Amino acid sequence: MPTVVVMDVSLSMTRPVSVEGSEEYQRKHLAAHGLTMLFEHMATNYKLEFTALVVFSSLWELMVPFTRDYNTLQEALSNMDDYDKTCLESALVGVCNIVQQEWGGAIPCQVVLVTDGCLGIGRGSLRHSLATQNQRSESSRFPLPFPFPSKLYVMCMANLEELQSTDSLECLERLIDLNNGEGQIFTIDGPLCLKNVQSMFGKLIDLAYTPFHAALKCGHLTADVQVFPRPEPFVIDEEIDPIPKVINTDLEIVGFIDIADISSPPVLSRHLVLPIALNKEGDEVGAGITDDNEDENSANQIAGKIPNFCVLLHGSLKVEGMVALVQLGPEWHGMLYSQADSKKKSNLMMSLFEPGPEPLPWLGKMAQLGPISDAKENPYGEDDNKSPFPLQPKNKRSYAQNVTVWIKPSGLQTDVQKILRNARKLPEKTQTFYKELNRLRKAALAFGFLDLLKGVADMLERECTLLPDTAHPDAAFQLTHAAQQLKLASTEYAVYDLNITPLHTDFSGSSTERM
């Protein structure tokens, strides 16, 4: 999931820190050191993740928009200036704006807030914001909870004793509570020094940025993979004492099924499945990135020459048009499938079903599915013309078909011109002419645009009078017939599902296309 790093650059972050040695450090230097450690870890293990950098004092500024270039993020850390007082609310408002603008309100996001625990003074301070949050209108509401799924991690450049001497810790804990309890506060254990800052950011990495490695198994075949993004624990609301369910690190394929049978099932989340190549010494080759481009290229070349079950599975699913059912845990399944990014690129994906013995009702209980060879006769038929599972409804779903949209006048003009072009090529274009005519008729009836039907009918009658002497006799009959049917469709007795069919005449030959 995307990450927004929010860095405090107020004057309080310039307070000096007594560190052993001659070099003088400020709290912002400790924060930059910790963030550098985080960015280096993400560049190695989370290189597909998008990260943005925001700085704030009384105002906020987007230093680096969402990017996968962690060198740019690290350069921005060394180019930050010092500003005035702390105003956390403005920073949180900025986070809301940039996340919603880039990702909308449905994509989960992690927010890493780096501050020294100073809440600001006067109007705009966190104390003032929390004290007045219940006295505001909807237009000026406090930005927490975020309007998107999120986790808020507060990294304090202060130890616990320093925060407890004031009400800073209590106010910061209130932020986590306002975000529906999603998040955590981290403080420095012991004196402020580089080592303890590394330890604090290490705890954040262990909690939120540890890559999920698993073993993908199918019979005797196995492959080490990374699942990205990391699957989150799932809590079943119906249970009296809900316990978060975590997927196993052993992902076992239990069977294969046609894409048409599984259709488009409801899923909890979707993840990339990336192979991890190991060399003979057991070190990872295909995961992460190296500092030197030549070393990276040579490592990728070595990884590409090693046979990998993950690659075999991906290619097989893509060619055969099937998905693999995978066991995630006790009574918990998912599916592996090939998803195309473009015409030339596709990825192996894994979607997680809801836990339970029967996540997809039309398949029945997962434990009762078996191989085709166990059936007395092929449940798909000899010609693969039937399915053992309940058939999908014949009516097309509204979201699964191309609909006619006339937002701009040019769209309507294009559809009318298409009908007229086909009308001039009758009878060769009879089938296409009536197809476009029926599409326009249904759209006009759906929108209540009856005047359009009358106007197109008049155009067709005019086209009939302009036919040259060399025109096929059937063209005039078809145009007159189509115009009459459109006029009937503009009355209150019109039937939406009725299609206008070609008029059968004695002039209709084998060259005329039939509906």
UniProtKB/Swiss-Prot annotation:
GO cellular component: INTAC complex; integrator complex; nucleus
Binding, Mg(2+): S10, S12, T86
Domain VWFA, residue spans: 2-204
GO biological process, one term: RNA polymerase II transcription initiation surveillance
PANTHER family associated with the record: INTEGRATOR COMPLEX SUBUNIT 14, PTHR13532
Function of the molecule: Component of the integrator complex, a multiprotein complex that terminates RNA polymerase II (Pol II) transcription in the promoter-proximal region of genes.
Protein's name in the database: Integrator complex subunit 14
Species per Swiss-Prot/TrEMBL record: Rattus norvegicus
